[in-house]
Amino acid sequence: MAKFPKKYSTVAEVEVVVMDAIPGEYDGKPTLATRFGVLSAKNVKTGAEEILADVVGTVQDFTIFSNDEGKLPAMVEDFVKGARITLNFQYNAENGRTRYRKPWVNPLQTDISILTPEERNILGL
């Protein structure tokens, strides 16, 4: 099982435009080398403004590596030349490193029509 750093935290969401994406290989496993322009940042946490000021308006290179089983994550499908996507910008305070992650999207739907008026009141809906 892969070991992941435990100290990364999301400090902002960045809007990017994919400028290039090239499949490759590292250690016999597939990779995707990407280059994207960081257009803007939103939901910037207090204290991260300076880091984001250095990133917004720049071109970034980011390589997506496969997992231990040799499979690339599903997020590679979004990295198509010309695509505009949102990524979580994460920072590790222990070593000063940054990384990008695709925001998790909750696929669940909230159908309040199944709730009684009392249940809606309890849930604040």
Predicted segments with their positions:
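A structural detector for beta-sheet-dominated domains
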Residues: 17-19, 37-39, 65, 88-90, ...
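OB-fold ssDNA-binding interfaces and closely related basic DNA-contact patches used
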Residues: 1-56
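Extended low-polarity, hydrophobic cluster-rich segments
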Residues: 38, 79-80, 89, 105
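Short nucleic-acid-contacting surface segments enriched for D/E, G, S/T with interspersed K/R
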Residues: 66-87
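A short, exposed loop/beta-hairpin motif centered on an aromatic-Gly-Thr core
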Residues: 59-65
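OB-fold/S1-family single-stranded nucleic acid-binding modules
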Residues: 90-121
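Short acidic DE-rich linear segments
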Residues: 2-6, 118-125
